[in-house]
Amino acid sequence: MIVSAQCDLRYATLEELEVQSAAAAVDWLSTDELDLWRKFRSDVRRDTFLAGRILAKRLLRAQHCTAALARPSQITIRSDASSSGVRPRIMLDGHRLAYSLSISHTCDAVLVGGTNRFGVSLGVDLVRMRTLGAAFERSWLTETESAFLRQNEDDMTVADIWAMKEAVFKAVHRGESFAPRSVEILLEPEGTTVHYHGRNLRDRCRLRVWRLGGEVAAVATYQRLGARPRPHNNKRSVSSAILTP
């Protein structure tokens, strides 16, 4: 486990989570989740959905004292299938748990992050390393980000910035839809500055990006309270890391 930016993270491959086991879905999914899982036509969609729930509930039961006493199938994680800016909601016995959760996956692995710190929301994103064309870069990156990318091609890729933007949006949004260019990541030697719809988030937003084999992982946390966290050094980090499932 790595504790980073006021949150706990878990990473695992689908193989490690044994999502193909006949009993896994029944053991880990609530009735509502099981109904939704059975409606998915794609095997990949079923496997990634199940993997995300398994890993998220492992993290939740380790962090939240109420959830620790519950069976995994008693916990329901509700999210918006259209990805239109609705955070996952965690329900137990009809009550919503006070916990900020974020789930992201590729076809092969899943990353989850969570925190029970009051006033802190977070977002995680997991992206496969691959070449992305000029059209994608134009639609996702601002001119400043593209210029930085050209100057730092050995250390940074479009996939890194993609993952960071997704993570920031998940942490910061208030229900609006995702617009990639509304999030601007300014990476400088003295630290990272994040703008959201032109607003400088300053020290309220903490951001980290690193590599996990052939994937890019990013986590962002956002302080929503009036009181700001203590000053910190928000330096960019692109490095390998190991997270336990």
Language model segments and positions:
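Core catalytic alpha/beta fold that binds nucleotide/phospho-ligands
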Residues: 1-245
